[in-house]
A protein has these predicted regions:
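Conserved binding/recognition cores within well-folded domains
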Residues: 1-83
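Short, charged, intrinsically disordered terminal tails
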Residues: 94-99
Length: 99
């Protein structure tokens, strides 16, 4: 089961060494679920893949700027920075309405 936290509170979800973590401003939760399972579960809630290891909550993105190699640097609303890989940059830009 998912940890008890509001979906809107999740900044991003990260997979590290076969473990999956949900990050909120106050806490980090570990879940048994795999990243692809959470992605399927949350796709209607404005969560998007940022890299092979990270899913971000688009509602919590404060700003973005281009990086070298067609990547993006996102600043979340808690000031944390996340790199979006080239593979997912276009999807994120489209979802945010950036051309």
């Amino acid at each position: 089961a998912l940890p008890i936290c509001l979906i809107a509170d999740i900044l991003y979800i990260e997979s590290v060494d076969r473990r999956t973590f949900l990050y909120t401003e106050q806490q980090i939760f570990e879940t048994e679920r795999r990243l692809y399972e959470l992605e399927a579960h949350l796709e209607k809630c404005s969560f998007f893949r940022a890299s092979k290891a990270i899913i971000i909550n688009l509602q919590r993105v404060q700003s973005l700027r281009p990086e070298l190699g067609a990547r993006l640097l996102l600043t979340m609303d808690n000031k944390e920075k996340i790199i979006v890989s080239r593979q997912y940059a276009k999807t994120i830009k489209n979802a945010l309405g950036v051309v």
